Regions:
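N-terminal catalytic cores of peptidoglycan-degrading enzymes
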Residues: 1-77
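Basic/polar, cationic surfaces and motifs that engage anionic cell-wall
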Residues: 4, 8-16, 89-154
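Hydrophobic faces of well-ordered beta-strands that scaffold small-molecule active sites
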Residues: 22, 82-84, 120-122
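Cell-envelope and extracellular/periplasmic
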Residues: 26, 66, 80-91
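A broadly tuned preference for mixed-charge, low-complexity surface segments
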Residues: 44, 63-80, 104-113, 134-140
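Catalytic nucleophile-His microenvironment captured as a short glycine-rich beta-strand/loop
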Residues: 47-52, 81-86, 110
Length: 154
C-alpha cells in the first residue's frame, strides 16, 4: 500500500465508486511489486488502486480515495472509478494468468459496489489519444469482446 502521507498526490478522499477503469501497463517486464515500488519512490501524480500481474493482485490505494488515472483532470474516470493496472507481459501465457486474476478482481468489485458491465471502462474511453489497455485491445480487438469474459454476480 502506498504510504498514507502520499495519498494526496494521487487523488482526493471520499470517492463514491461508480465504475472501474481498466489499464495495461506499457512496461513489458515490470511486476506488480515493481510498479508499486516505483509509485512509492517517484513523485508522479498518476495513480491506480490495484496492480495485477501473473503472481498477485496488489491494492496500492484505498477504495475511498479517487486516483488520477484517466488524464482528464476532474473527469468521471478520475473521480468515481476504481483503477486497475494489468501488467503487460510479452509472454502471453503469463499475461493471461494476470488477466484472469484481474477478471476475478473485477467481478468481485462489481458485486461489492453493485456495478454492471456498463460500468466498466477502458482508459481510452476517456482519452481517444491513448491505446490503453493496449494488450487487451491487441488480443480482443474491442471492449465488447473483453467484457464477454466477465460474469455479473447478481
Amino acid at each position: 500500500m502506498i504510504p498514507k502521507e502520499k495519498w494526496k498526490q494521487y487523488g482526493l478522499p471520499n470517492m463514491e465508486v461508480k465504475g472501474i477503469v481498466i489499464h495495461n501497463t506499457n512496461n513489458q517486464r515490470a511486476s506488480a511489486a515493481d510498479l508499486e515500488k516505483w509509485m512509492i519512490e517517484n513523485n508522479t501524480s498518476q495513480g491506480t488502486h490495484f496492480i495485477v500481474d501473473h503472481n498477485e493482485v496488489r491494492q496500492v490505494m484505498p477504495l475511498d480515495w479517487s486516483v488520477w488515472n484517466t488524464g482528464g483532470g476532474m473527469d468521471f474516470g478520475n473521480l468515481h472509478c476504481i483503477s486497475i493496472e494489468i501488467c503487460s507481459n510479452p509472454n502471453n501465457r503469463l499475461y493471461l494468468q494476470g488477466q484472469l486474476k484481474a477478471i476475478d478482481l473485477i467481478e468481485s468489485l462489481m458485486h461489492e459496489f453493485n456495478l454492471t458491465k456498463y460500468d466498466i471502462y477502458f482508459h481510452r474511453d476517456f482519452n481517444n489519444n491513448v491505446n490503453c489497455p493496449s494488450q487487451i485491445l491487441s488480443m480482443y480487438g474491442n471492449k465488447k469482446n473483453f467484457l464477454s469474459m466477465i460474469k455479473e454476480k447478481r
